[in-house]
């Protein structure tokens, strides 16, 4: 049998039942975004994100990005993050992330259809990393594209918009 088609995405047959609320995320995504923050010039970035599974009740998550110029040419590597996403009772989502910048975070939120809202629950910064005190993330599937936004409070700033992107499913 193999795979079951569901709406605009395919559900792998061996996806753990707990992960069905996240089935629309499974796979690879690629696109572009923009970023800004106080004392940081605005920038554009290219991004690749993947959500994979091995039959257990969590998704493996990997994201990497590159700063790009106005011609979409890569200037340099930027942020990378890895983590695990798991759905608990009542579509509560728990996410653990680690960043190449020396930050690790725990996030808690809700999956509601093709929309995810997360709030940072706990954070850790290595001695040389910036201090992030709060964050919120939004993920949503709109007309087949994955839209993301990340609001951050860091280095004494209040919670405010930092990153947003639009990604297309690959393959």
Segment roles from a protein language model:
Residues 101-104, 111-136:
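Acidic, glycine-rich flexible loop segments
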Residues 43-45, 79, 103, 131-133, ...:
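Residues that act as N-cap/strand-start positions at coil-to-secondary-structure junctions
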Residues 46-52, 81-86, 106-110, 134-140, ...:
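Hydrophobic/aromatic beta-strand elements that line small-molecule binding cavities or substrate pockets
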């Amino acid at each position: 049998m193999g795979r079951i088609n569901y709406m605009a995405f395919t559900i792998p047959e061996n996806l753990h039942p707990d992960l069905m609320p996240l089935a629309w995320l499974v796979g690879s995504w690629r696109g572009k975004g923009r970023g800004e923050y106080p004392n940081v010039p605005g920038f554009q970035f290219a991004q690749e994100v993947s959500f994979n599974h091995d039959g257990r009740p969590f998704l493996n998550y990997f994201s990497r990005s590159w700063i790009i110029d106005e011609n979409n040419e890569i200037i340099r590597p930027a942020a990378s993050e890895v983590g695990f996403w798991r759905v608990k009772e009542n579509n509560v989502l728990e996410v653990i992330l680690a960043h190449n910048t020396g930050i690790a975070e725990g996030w808690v939120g809700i999956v509601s259809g093709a929309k995810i809202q997360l709030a940072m629950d706990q954070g850790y910064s290595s001695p040389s990393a910036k201090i992030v005190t709060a964050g919120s993330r939004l993920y949503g599937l709109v007309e087949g594209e994955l839209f993301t936004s990340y609001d951050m409070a860091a280095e004494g700033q209040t919670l405010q918009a930092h990153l947003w992107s639009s990604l297309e499913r690959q393959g």
